[in-house]
Amino acid sequence: MKRTYQPNKRKRSKVHGFRSRMSTANGRKVLAARRRKGRKVLSA
């Protein structure tokens, strides 16, 4: 059985990237929450 995590840069940024987070209202909420918490990295 193959492992569940098969790294792929393009898919990673499409799903978890900054642009994809900015494209939806809830994604912007995620970024706001991470800024409020003081995360060094906001998105993938």
UniProtKB/Swiss-Prot annotation:
Would you tell me the protein name for this molecule? Answer: Large ribosomal subunit protein bL34
Q: Basic residues bias located where? A: 1-19, 31-44
The organism's lineage?
Bacteria, Bacillati, Bacillota, Bacilli, Bacillales
Query: Gene symbol?
Result: rpmH
Q: Which GO terms describe its biological process?
A: translation
Map out region (Disordered) in residue numbers. 1-44
Q: Which GO terms describe its cellular component?
A: ribonucleoprotein complex; ribosome
Keyword hit for Aminoacyl-tRNA synthetase: no
Q: Which InterPro entries match?
A: Ribosomal_bL34, Ribosomal_bL34_CS
Query: By its UniProt entry, which HAMAP family does this protein fall under?
Result: Ribosomal_bL34 (MF_00391)
Instruction: Tell me which PANTHER family the record gives.
Output: LARGE RIBOSOMAL SUBUNIT PROTEIN BL34M, MITOCHONDRIAL RIBOSOMAL PROTEIN 34 FAMILY MEMBER
Q: Which UniProt keywords apply?
A: Ribonucleoprotein, Ribosomal protein
Family (UniProt): Belongs to the bacterial ribosomal protein bL34 family.
Q: Which GO terms describe its molecular function?
A: structural constituent of ribosome
